[in-house]
Design a protein with these regions (language model features):
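Conserved HGGG/HGGXW glycine-rich cap/lid loop of the alpha/beta-hydrolase fold
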Residues: 40-102
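Conserved acidic catalytic loop of the alpha/beta-hydrolase fold
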Residues: 113-131
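Conserved hydrolase catalytic core segment
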Residues: 129-171
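Helix-rich cap/lid subdomain of alpha/beta-hydrolase
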Residues: 160-216, 220-231
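Short beta-strand/loop motif that positions the catalytic acidic residue
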Residues: 246, 252-254, 258
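Catalytic active-site module of serine/aspartate enzymes centered on a nucleophile-bearing elbow/loop
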Residues: 276-316
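Regulatory hinge/linker segments at domain boundaries
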Residues: 308-330, 385-387
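Basic, Lys/Arg-enriched C-terminal extension of HTH/homeodomain DNA-binding domains
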Residues: 361-390
Length: 390
């Protein structure tokens, strides 16, 4: 794990957005037209999952977590800056978790395997081959599990406020049971006192408007029964054995004073993932808010990190090489054998050979000179910012 602490940039250097009104999903956001396309796909057990695609650029898949709503999130002062600013730079794919938002309220028997299966269903429905993953809060563990099981499809992993093990494994069983009981008792009551407990935990530095929106989202995004079942299921999550198998470069960020997921759980997560970068943010909010400096730091860090693969899935240079082919090409230029390249990228030797065949064809080289010519081209290509190699 590579750890560092980041201080907020001075105001003049922060990434900012001019506030504005929102007419709703597909309406005006910050003075610009926002359009998302909501579609449905069917999970293996028949549950219908709602997903949305917006923006353009390299694909970024935000793994689902509880309490989301594809339409309401656009109107929310808690989430709309996430959608706007990430969607400005990427083709942003997100989906409502089973039991939440526009997806079926039937949750079945939720588990890591089920949630990973839902993610598989969504990315296949969208038609993505290779993409970056964003896992926030409970979704971090699912992003880790997917990346470990599908190394050839994940280019980068960004995790915020996440954990590798649920409350059942971190000595917080009593807290979990108390919250589950409170959910069942007060989720839909007219009195907002119960929901205020949640907003105080998740958004301790939120404005009155942000906290009110979040409290309303709790009630509108899912039922009390589904919320309790999903919360309890998250407590049983444990991907500690899968995290060391993640091959994609990974950035882990965590708020220093997070009251929902203690910072030590974020550190543990980063420690378990080989060569992960860990950044501590100066915040107490489990959901980063637009007005706090930590949001600007988060956004700049995520873009710098994903920028190393910003052309993922797009043609690169006149040769039209994909990002994965460029990765193979750079390792060839470092003198690695096909077997070593396969080990570095978590691929089979046969897959590496197929990539090389495609590279040689695009570069119009062949024979013994092919490998040398390809390597020579590699050193001429613009190098992205490098992170420590595995």
């Amino acid at each position: 794990m590579h750890r560092r602490q980041v201080s907020p940039a001075p105001p003049s250097q922060r990434l900012g957005v001019t506030p504005g009104g929102l007419a709703g999903a597909g309406g005006e956001l910050y003075g610009r037209s926002v359009k998302q396309h909501v579609r449905f796909c069917t999970a293996r057990d028949g549950v219908r999952l709602a997903y949305a695609v917006q923006g353009s650029g390299p694909p970024l898949v935000r793994v689902a977590t509880w309490l989301s709503h594809l339409e309401l999130d656009w109107e929310s002062p808690v989430w709309r800056h996430w959608l706007k600013q990430l969607g400005d730079r990427h083709t942003l794919v997100r989906y409502d978790e089973r039991g939440c938002g526009l997806s079926d309220r039937n949750i079945g028997d939720p588990s890591v395997d089920v949630w990973v299966g839902d993610l598989e269903t969504v990315v296949d429905a969208v038609g993505l081959e290779r993409f970056a993953l964003l896992g926030v809060s409970q979704a971090a563990a699912i992003a880790v599990a997917y990346a470990a099981r599908h190394p050839d499809r994940v280019s980068r992993v960004v995790l915020y406020g996440g954990y590798a093990r649920g409350r059942r494994f971190s000595g917080q069983v009593r807290e979990e049971e108390a919250i589950v009981a409170a959910i069942r008792a007060g989720w839909t009551t007219p009195n907002p006192a119960f929901r205020r407990m949640f907003s105080a935990l998740y958004l301790p530095n939120g404005t009155a408007e942000q906290m009110a929106w979040y409290e309303d989202l709790l009630r509108r995004s899912t039922t009390a029964g589904a919320a309790a079942a999903l919360y309890r299921a998250r407590g049983r999550v444990n991907v500690c054995d899968l995290a060391p198998q993640v091959c994609a470069r990974t950035l882990v960020m965590h708020a220093r004073d997070d009251r929902v997921v203690p910072v030590q759980e974020g550190r543990l997560l980063a420690t378990l993932i080989p060569d992960a970068h860990f950044i501590l943010l100066d915040s107490a909010n489990h959901i980063l808010l637009e007005q706090e400096p930590a949001w600007d730091v988060f956004l700049s860090e995520i873009e710098a990190f994903l920028g190393t693969d910003a052309r993922s899935g797009l043609p690169i240079g006149a040769a039209g090489l994909t990002a994965r082919e460029l990765e193979v090409l750079r390792l060839v230029s470092e003198g690695l054998t096909n077997q070593s390249i396969a080990g570095r990228l978590c691929l089979s030797v046969r897959t590496v050979e197929r990539h090389l065949t495609n590279i040689y064809a695009k570069l119009q080289v062949s024979g013994k000179a092919g490998r040398a010519s390809a390597a020579a081209l590699s050193v001429q290509l613009d190098e992205p910012p490098r992170f420590p190699s595995r």
